From Swiss-Prot:
It comes from Parvibaculum lavamentivorans (strain DS-1 / DSM 13023 / NCIMB 13966). GO terms for molecular function: crossover junction DNA endonuclease activity; DNA binding; magnesium ion binding. GO terms for cellular component: cytoplasm; Holliday junction resolvase complex. The active site is at residues 11, 71, 143. The lineage of its organism: Bacteria, Pseudomonadati, Pseudomonadota, Alphaproteobacteria, Hyphomicrobiales. Keywords: Cytoplasm, DNA damage, DNA recombination, DNA repair, DNA-binding, Endonuclease, Hydrolase, Magnesium, Metal-binding, Nuclease. Pfam families: RuvC. Binds 2 Mg(2+) ion per subunit. Belongs to the RuvC family. Its EC number is 3.1.21.10. This is Crossover junction endodeoxyribonuclease RuvC. The keyword Transferase does not apply.
């Protein structure tokens, strides 16, 4: 019987952080849940980061993933926007690591190539392929679709030994 694992994909952003949880058993992928954590633009940066942190803690607590995949930052022309994205990414990395998850990072083009087959796929192509690979899945937002794509990419990238080791760790930890 194949080992079953759960992966969390996180598409970080200050305004909207997408998340998606998938299961993998052998080569079979299943959709578990997805959503978007939004922060209130009227709050201070620190308070908005706390909102993202609280949302991710809740997702991890509810779904108990075995590993997480976080999108790497792309180079933005707006330095201020790049810094804010970096801070949201730091929250995603910190929350995942603090929960004891193995955390992988993937460049956007790598995720697109892994899921769609083309490194420069657009958002509609990503959503379409995610919904094809995860029957019954309906991504609630572009951010959630991107997060599901990250989880799928991680499922495709992980070796069987990593999957087995993660499952054994999970079983030993009594999760």
């Amino acid at each position: 019987m194949p080992v079953s694992l759960t992966y969390l994909g996180i598409d970080p952003g200050l305004t909207a952080t997408g998340w998606g949880v998938i299961g993998i058993s052998g080569s079979r992928l299943t959709h578990i849940a997805n959503g978007t954590i939004t922060s209130n633009a009227r709050l201070s940066l620190a308070e908005r980061l706390v909102q993202i942190e609280a949302g991710l803690v809740q997702v991890i607590h509810e779904h108990a993933p075995d590993a997480a995949a976080v999108e790497q930052a792309f180079v933005a022309r707006d330095a201020s926007a790049a810094l804010k994205l970096g801070q949201a990414r730091a929250i995603a990395l910190l929350v995942s690591a603090r929960a004891g998850l193995a955390v992988a990072e993937y460049a956007p083009n790598h995720v697109k190539k892994s899921v769609v087959g083309a490194g420069h796929a657009d958002k509609s192509q990503i959503r379409l392929m995610v919904e094809m690979l995860l029957p019954g899945a309906k991504a609630g937002s572009e951010h959630a679709a991107d997060a599901l794509a990250l989880a799928i990419c991680h499922a495709h990238s992980g070796s069987a030994n990593e999957r087995i080791a993660a499952a054994l760790l999970r079983a030993g930890a009594g999760r």
